[in-house]
Amino acid sequence: MIYGIGIDITNIDRFKTLHNPATFIQKVLTPTEFDEFEAKKGQRAYEFLAGHFSVKESYSKAYGTGLGKKLNFQDIEINYDGVGKPKIVKHPFSGTVHVSISHSDHHVVTQVILEGDN
């Protein structure tokens, strides 16, 4: 049974003009994600940050709470399997989580499907 579906589109370029990037990055990325982010350079770093931001937005929509008091960025962690497929490895949902990320030059679109009962 589908519990929820969340979709988000984010403009990658907006992450290039953050007023306080260090604070924002610490808010959005878990320590494990931050370690991976630090290894990225240039456009790839912006794509990574925008992608993780967007996945967490999509997850919060699928979960039904949005990001805020009940769910925050640190409650959700994304990593990748051996072939680069994204997976959400830390989250409050007890069922199965499906995630997809796609980038263009200027945008990232993500979808999260939560399957099962919570």
UniProtKB/Swiss-Prot annotation:
Family matches, as PANTHER family: L-AMINOADIPATE-SEMIALDEHYDE DEHYDROGENASE-PHOSPHOPANTETHEINYL TRANSFERASE, PHOSPHOPANTETHEINE TRANSFERASE
Q: Coiled coil: which residue ranges?
A: none
| Keyword hit for Protease | no
Catalysed reaction, written as an equation: apo-[ACP] + CoA = holo-[ACP] + adenosine 3',5'-bisphosphate + H(+)
Q: Where does Mg(2+) bind?
A: D8, E57
SUPFAM superfamilies on file? 4'-phosphopantetheinyl transferase (SSF56214)
Any idea which GO molecular function terms this record carries? Answer: holo-[acyl-carrier-protein] synthase activity; magnesium ion binding
Q: Which cofactor does it need?
A: Mg(2+)
Annotated protein name in UniProt: Holo-[acyl-carrier-protein] synthase
EC number of this enzyme = 2.7.8.7
Whose protein is this, by species?
Pediococcus pentosaceus (strain ATCC 25745 / CCUG 21536 / LMG 10740 / 183-1w)
Provide a GO CC annotation, any one.
cytosol
The primary location reported for this protein is: cytoplasm
* Keyword Lipid biosynthesis listed: yes
Q: Which domain of life is it from?
A: Bacteria
A Pfam family reported for this protein in Swiss-Prot or TrEMBL:
ACPS
List localization entries.
Cytoplasm
Which keywords does this Swiss-Prot/TrEMBL entry list? Cytoplasm, Fatty acid biosynthesis, Fatty acid metabolism, Lipid biosynthesis, Lipid metabolism, Magnesium, Metal-binding, Transferase
Functional description taken from the UniProt entry: Transfers the 4'-phosphopantetheine moiety from coenzyme A to a Ser of acyl-carrier-protein.
Which family is this protein grouped under? Belongs to the P-Pant transferase superfamily. AcpS family.
Single Gene Ontology BP term?
lysine biosynthetic process via aminoadipic acid
